[in-house]
Amino acid sequence: MARSKIALIGAGQIGGTLAHLAALKELGDIVLFDIAEGTPQGKALDLAESGPVEGFNASLKGANSYADIAGADVIIVTAGVPRKPGMSRDDLLGINLKVMDAVGGGIKQYAPDAFVICITNPLDAMVWALQKSSGLAPAKIVGMAGVLDSARFRYFLSEEFKVSVEDVTAFVLGGHGDDMVPSLRYSTVAGIPLTDLVKLGWTTQERLDAIVERTRKGGGEIVNLLKTGSAFYAPAASAIAMAEAYLKDKRRVLPCAAQLSGQYGVDNLYVGVPVVIGANGVEKIVEVTLDESEKAMFAKSVESVRGLVEACKVINPALAG
């Protein structure tokens, strides 16, 4: 039985961490691609040399040619410029849009059957542009945002309640930006709704509201602390969870940026919603019921994404077709 092939486009902090996690989990053979000569080769060799210690047998290869991603089963895209202090995700739009055009062309030519996970920011607009440039079916290309944002939300809640993160269930809707919608109503601790925990005196509504706001600003908090880059451990772990769900046909319910076609009243936009990921990619979009407050917040988030997509069309009119 042939091993799966995983291509990682971008050999920066996230790309290197993705390669390490994929190797440790033995998800398949790994190609680390970057336009910077020597960088992917050096990281691939370094990781391969950790194999005898870690006990994994994955093949790792560094590459500067898209031809090396040929036949990939999964492609994870991190290529582009990361955020720096003072930058919004949206400031990256013009720079990273050009990167998505090049990456999409490479995928279209060499790996048109892959399941693609995009991490590049501004996420919802970049995965939309990547779908356009690659020509992949919408079910085979998603954005990694909700798993990460939900993980941050779960971590903050576990810290508040002083319980294991394993017992905290939470998810985040909407775009991957300051207008995201961390859902208190659909979040629980061991099945107990957060509203009940407020009544039990475990926390207050004000403290929960502060956690929601911290979740929205979670990426920026790390950017400001690092000063020279952005988060990479948690984003990489989140994308690997998505890749594993696809490769192992787990049918996991994960919040991802998926293309909507009428769900939540939205058409032809990539927005963060719960989806089922299995061997066919996005197998189902889960349309949860939103109350009036959540609908208003979700609509605001969708409009933010729509604004970015319209800006993409202005920068590159070819995407408007």
Swiss-Prot record:
Query: In which domain of life is the source organism classified?
Result: Bacteria
* Annotated positions binding substrate: R83, R89, N121, R152
Q: Has the keyword NADP been applied to this entry? A: no
> What does the record give as the reaction this protein catalyses?
(S)-malate + NAD(+) = oxaloacetate + NADH + H(+)
* Coiled-coil zones: none
The residues listed in the UniProt record as binding NAD(+), with positions renumbered to this chain, are: G10, A11, G12, Q13, I14, G15, D34, N96, I119, T120, N121
Name the InterPro entries for this protein.
L-lactate/malate_DH, Lactate/malate_DH_C, Lactate/malate_DH_N, Lactate_DH/Glyco_Ohase_4_C, Malate_DH_type3, NAD(P)-bd_dom_sf
Q: What is this protein's name?
A: Malate dehydrogenase
Provide the gene name from the record.
mdh
